[in-house]
Amino acid sequence: MGPVDTSQRLARLRELMQERKVDVYIVPSEDSHQSEYIAPCDGRREFISGFTGSAGCAIVSMSKAALSTDGRYFNQAAKQLDNNWMLLKRGFENMPTWQEWTAEQAEGGKVVGVDPSLITASEARSLSETIEKSGGSLQGVQENLIDLVWGKERPARPSEKVALHPIEFAGKSFEEKISDLRKELQKKKSAGFVISMLDEIAWLFNLRGNDIPYNPVFFAYAIITPTTADLYIDDEKLPAEVKKYLGDQVSVKPYGSIFEDAKALSQSAQKKSDGDASTSPSEKFLISTKASWSLSLALGGEKNVEEVRSPITDAKAIKNEAELEGMRACHIRDGAALTEYFAWLENELVNKKTVLNEVDGSDKLEQIRSKHKHFVGLSFDTISSTGPNAAVIHYKAERDTCSIIDPKAVYLCDSGAQYLDGTTDTTRTLHFGEPTEMERKAYTLVLKGLISIDTAVFPKGTTGFALDAFARQHLWKEGLDYLHGTGHGVGSYLNVHEGPIGLGTRVQYAEVAITPGNVISDEPGFYEDGVFGIRIENIIIAKEVKTTHGFGEKPWLGFEHVTMTPLCQKLINPSLLTDGEKKWVNDYHSKVWEKTSSYFENDELTRNWLKRETQPI
């Protein structure tokens, strides 16, 4: 997608800024729940900038506009931003962060405005300090200025019905989960926990929704105290069976009343403090470090609130046995769907000489997936990319402008689905012609990185920050690298990107150790801008493993892969693999055949393709 002319939108925004005496205005990507993926009505940064990537921040002054994003989106942003915008490449030397750039624009006593519901309390404090050093000030602007510019064209807020997530898939009742949470509150001597993250609420109550594309969540807040459980959600979203399910253990309150109730809790806490300067720990409410600045302010700020890494996000990331079994099962079905798609695609392109574009491919894959048991929908927008488009890390093919799939070029497909028993995310890079030596070399180096993570053995307490280099080492030896993390946590019929764990250089990945039951993606890559891109992705489960010595008398961990989709034999250069790596590939392909071949008893085309692609190397 090319640039959108943002001139009129920026002009109107600057008029509103001037009326409110705001000199610089920040437009984050997130919604009021700090969601990575958002509903169309919350796509404010995309509306004002024209940039459609999932990560980034827009900053507008009276004379300039800047968009900051990370390495996954540099190419995309360069194509989508019009001449009104400058691109701030996150992580580049001699390139200011968006916070630093904002502070520069605020020099000389200027006011920086932001909707306080769209940034966290800790972000607000840090940003305020940075801006004050330059002589400016940060101000919360309650009325969102982008919404005013957007006007009647802004999409309506979703009001989809909520559904039960059966215990056979959840593995644990919501009553048990709330009981566990209350034990954590007791340990911290807290008055309660105010929950704002949508996937945490869905997980806690074993409910699923459809308010955000690809993410089975719903708009809600919750407050859990030692004796009460309040769910803030619009009443029309709750079918009778859900109300009956929640029973008298959960009080349902209007979604919009959360801030009023938070203020009441704040006032109650202040009265209990008997005039002391700060409330005692037993009277403080916990909020996640990802809760909004506006929610923190409603609760009375730091004197009444303790910001913590959410105990729910930790519990949710450690899957129980029912969730793990679901992840294994859905990846077998999903692997079969991908195998059928790749066999079909090769036959159409090579044998039938059919002309297909990238969207034709992604549409066909969704149709094949939809036939499988427990399928609900996709877990993200499929990346179907040919040739140079594969070098755009988060490429999105648009029906009117996408490329024809070239059988003589690399084809990268990154896709996933939501099933009732789990969430999938798989990337495969294929070639239907004769790959170049560089393409084979790059693919094989990336494969070696994937195998290094898959076969890693490490002591309890090791973080994903430490493991990240395992995947990059083979590329590093050649002076190559990739500008994205190696892996992210994956939800169980929830968000495909799930914290707090992952493999990469983000600070948070150094704070949380890999734990048995974590489900993580393993997805190294390599990208040559304008030429081709390689990425291979499997989903892995952390587990305890036996070692010969067990140094330190502590558990040692490793991984189990659950993705069951063949690698591309044509792109593997066996001479670059060790004997151990060749054995891994052969063992993996043997397992893929064992788990998925039965799906193709009556499909000779796919069965033959699968047999060929899983032959020993």
UniProtKB/Swiss-Prot annotation:
GO cellular component terms attached to this protein's record: cytoplasm
Organism from which the protein derives: Ajellomyces dermatitidis (strain ER-3 / ATCC MYA-2586)
Classification via Gene3D superfamilies: Creatinase/methionine aminopeptidase superfamily, Creatinase/prolidase N-terminal domain
Function: Catalyzes the removal of a penultimate prolyl residue from the N-termini of peptides.
EC number from the UniProt entry: 3.4.11.9
The protein, known as: Probable Xaa-Pro aminopeptidase P
Keywords tagged on the record: Aminopeptidase, Hydrolase, Manganese, Metal-binding, Metalloprotease, Protease
Short name of one Pfam family: Peptidase_M24
GO molecular function: metal ion binding; metalloaminopeptidase activity
Named cofactor requirement(s): Mn(2+)
Sequence positions that bind Mn(2+) 2: 414, 425, 537
PANTHER family: XAA-PRO AMINOPEPTIDASE 1
Cofactor binding mode and count: Binds 2 manganese ions per subunit.
InterPro entries on file: Creatin/AminoP/Spt16_N, Creatinase/aminopeptidase-like, Creatinase_N, Pept_M24, Pept_M24B, Peptidase_M24_C, Peptidase_M24B_aminopep-P_CS, X-Pro_aminopeptidase_P
Gene (UniProt): AMPP
GO biological process, one term: proteolysis
Family that this chain belongs to: Belongs to the peptidase M24B family.
Residue numbers binding Mn(2+) 1: 425, 523, 537
Reactions catalysed according to its record: Release of any N-terminal amino acid, including proline, that is linked to proline, even from a dipeptide or tripeptide
